[in-house]
């Protein structure tokens, strides 16, 4: 399409995006996890053990999350470097090294004052647990003046898919982005923490 034209284009490919939006987004995995952990803490108390809501092999499989700021920086990099990234160049973008939920889940739970552990038989799916304990969320929302309808508008099917069904190794090759000089990276759990801080400032989440 761009051949012979004054413009060019780049295709930027993230894996699962972790980030913040001011309204609800059906594919906001970070928001779904945060709502679940907030309700879990309200119901079970600080220090409670939270089993990973997926399968055992999914808990150990590798993946490459993409924090929204890393994605945005790659898109800006491509826009201002058409000589390196144009002509239909395709670039994977992710936080950095691949991770497993065994590395990330305990840290996410710890952020909420909980103890993350591996999958456990008989665990209630995230979306069911939240719906069964909706009053606990409503109490938090009233206490902290949170936005309305967050549970109802959360894309629980997507959150379930990312943690439960998307349970195979998916290592993202970042070598092409690195070869043109894009070296931005972030610790995967830190991407969640920053996103959650932004959600709290926007009255989407209660204090941790």
Residue ranges of each PLM-predicted region?
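N-terminal Rossmann-like NAD(P)+-binding domain of SDR-like oxidoreductases, especially those catalyzing
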Residues: 1
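NAD(P)-dependent short-chain dehydrogenase/reductase
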Residues: 4-73, 77
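Residue-level "edge-of-site" marker
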Residues: 15, 122, 190-191
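Short secondary-structure capping/turn micro-motifs that flank functional sites
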Residues: 18, 193-195
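Aromatic-glycine-rich donor-binding/catalytic loop that engages nucleotide-sugar donors
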Residues: 58, 179-185
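Short, solvent-exposed loop/helix junctions and linker helices
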Residues: 65, 98, 185-186
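Mid/C-terminal beta-alpha module of Rossmann-like enzyme folds, strongest
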Residues: 71-160, 165, 173-175, 179, ...
């Amino acid at each position: 399409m761009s051949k012979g034209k004054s413009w060019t284009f780049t295709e930027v490919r993230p894996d699962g995006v972790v980030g913040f939006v001011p309204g609800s987004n059906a594919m906001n995995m970070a928001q779904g996890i945060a709502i679940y952990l907030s309700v879990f803490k309200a119901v079970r108390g600080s220090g409670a053990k939270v089993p990973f809501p997926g399968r055992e092999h999914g808990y150990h499989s590798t993946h490459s999350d993409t924090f929204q700021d890393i994605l945005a920086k790659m898109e800006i990099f491509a826009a201002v470097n058409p000589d390196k990234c144009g002509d239909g160049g395709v670039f994977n973008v992710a936080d950095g090294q691949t991770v497993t939920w065994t590395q990330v889940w305990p840290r996410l739970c710890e952020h909420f004052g909980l103890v993350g552990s591996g999958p456990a038989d008989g665990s209630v799916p995230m979306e069911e647990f939240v719906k069964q304990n909706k009053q606990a969320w409503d109490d938090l929302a009233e206490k902290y003046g949170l936005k309305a309808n967050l549970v109802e508008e959360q894309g629980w099917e997507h959150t379930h898919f990312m943690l439960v069904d998307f349970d195979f190794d998916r290592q993202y090759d970042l070598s092409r982005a690195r070869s043109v000089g894009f070296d931005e990276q972030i610790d995967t759990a830190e991407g969640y923490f920053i996103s959650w801080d932004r959600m709290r400032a926007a009255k989407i989440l209660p204090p941790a």
